């Protein structure tokens, strides 16, 4: 139980630091807060609504991982390093892919809701 409690505190601390230090995290939390009520309006089924919220949460997860990679890379060196630059670019690409995927989920859900598909 103590291990679970410590993990919970670490989770809270990590999320709090990310919120304080990264605008993208704050923006994605706003998107997640907006997604909650919108998903229930747009979702044709309960499961579709859950999927819509989950895909936005997934973007937040990927952004947190990308932020962790960037912070670690910046800690290793502040000098320009092409390999670290490529690693950061890959993290950014992961966020981009997650955003496109989320956008497609929402687009198809809206199309389904209005009867286009």
PLM region spans:
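Hydrophobic alpha-helical transmembrane segments
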Residues: 2-68, 76, 80-82, 88, ...
């Amino acid at each position: 139980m103590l291990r679970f409690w410590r993990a919970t505190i670490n989770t809270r601390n990590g999320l709090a630091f990310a919120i304080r230090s990264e605008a993208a995290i704050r923006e994605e939390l706003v998107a997640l807060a907006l997604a909650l009520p919108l998903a229930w309006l747009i979702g044709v089924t309960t499961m579709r609504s859950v999927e819509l919220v989950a895909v936005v949460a997934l973007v937040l997860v990927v952004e947190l991982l990308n932020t962790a990679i960037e912070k670690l890379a910046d800690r290793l060196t502040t000098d320009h390093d092409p390999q670290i630059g490529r690693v950061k670019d890959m993290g950014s690409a992961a966020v981009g892919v997650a955003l496109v995927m989320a956008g497609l989920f929402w687009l198809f859900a809206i199309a389904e809701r209005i009867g286009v598909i």
